[in-house]
A protein has these predicted regions:
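Intrinsically disordered, low-complexity regulatory regions
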Residues: 1-96
């Protein structure tokens, strides 16, 4: 079954082939501050480029994903990309 490609890690087949996704490896290798900075940096990247690409909706989804993961990591919750999908009610304005 082919999933709808919303641009997030939850449905990217190339990530599912590995035992761990890159985000999980980084979580284990980085300090908490480094990891939070990585998540925040990716949020900013996708927010800034979304209006200049053909895949605006995908970049918006990716930005939401990184913002949501940021809130989890800040609470010391281990991110499992397939499990931790962004809830529809998640609000990330003023997050940082």
């Amino acid at each position: 079954m082919k999933l709808n490609n919303d641009g997030t890690a939850t449905n990217q087949e190339h990530y599912k082939k590995a035992a761990m996704q890159p985000i999980e490896v980084m979580q284990r290798l980085f300090t908490k501050e480094q990891f939070l900075g990585f998540l925040m940096g990716n949020y900013i990247k996708y927010e800034m480029r979304k209006d200049y690409k053909n895949s605006q909706e995908q970049d918006e989804n990716k930005a939401r994903q990184y913002a949501y993961w940021y809130t989890l990591a800040k609470q010391d919750i281990y991110i499992e990309p397939v499990k931790h999908t962004v809830p529809k009610e998640f609000i990330f304005e003023g997050l940082f």
